[in-house]
Amino acid sequence: AYEALDVLYPFNRYSEQAQLELIYCYYQDGDSPSAKVAAERFIHLYPNSVHSDYAYYMQAVSDMDQDRGWYLRYIPIDLSLRYPGTMRLGYHEFAELINRYPNSRYAPDARQRMVYLRNLFASYELHIADYYFRRKAYVAAANRANEIIHHYQGAPEVQKALVIMIK
């Protein structure tokens, strides 16, 4: 229905709200790629909208959730064991939201999600460093640990990375 409204009346006064509802509907339906595309479209069509912060937020959330897949709702899997993929893009989009709209109502949640993602990325890198260490590839393990220390300051895995470098 929202798509039809947009096709028939692309620039009427309800079009902007229909685009926002479409983003939400796609996301709630579990279609993160379509939610992201709809959010990007909204940002392109309405760059000065008072609701642009919501579109940036949903764009980032969609990227964060895109790698999870439907099966992770039913099977508990440690996400730090999987390649982060579009979660990295989501992290940068949360940062863009905070830079553009620091006083947005979505900024506090974006900051929390960035901390979660930073810790997830650090944990992923730590798993790789540990793998290299167990394989006796000490230089590769030290390089990964060094990357954790330099790129993920504040993450709990920094201390574990230091231990790998000391060994």
Specify the residue positions occupied by each region the protein language model found.
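Acidic, polar-rich low-complexity tracts and alpha-helical solenoid repeat scaffolds
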Residues: 1-167
